[in-house]
Amino acid sequence: GNRLARRFETEVNQFAGISMRDRPMSEFDALVCDLWHGCGMGHLTLDWSYGASGFLAVKLDHSPMEDIGPKGHTADDLFTGVLEGFFGYFSEPGLLCVQTGDRRLGDKEGTTFILAFAEVIKKVESLRAEKISHGVIVARLGSD
């Protein structure tokens, strides 16, 4: 994820002549989502509205991993590391990612993740251990 982010930043900066870090968030979001889809990694949706609460909610549709592995296996767990490395490159050190839902396991909200720092991730992991859905986790974190 980190190497992908570095290459992405270098190539976009060279092409556009404007640093990725100086772009409005809406442009950054559009470029990242286009990159994700263009690399065949599915359709990424980022909910930036929870940034002030210390986390980002992420949804991945049409993941290439959805049909791989035995039934009951968390198919997109490898994307946890890719997301963590990619977004960690653009953030403060210590950004972590937890998968909070998987379409293959029947999660109605689809394949979902939370990006946050350690304090929030501890809460996410605790809620996930209780089998709490992504939407409820997001609502609880957003109200803290």
Regions found by a protein language model. Give the residues of each.
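Active-site helix/loop of acyl-thioester processing domains in fatty-acid/polyketide metabolism
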Residues: D77-G94
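N-terminal accessory segment detector
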Residues: G1-L78, L96-D144
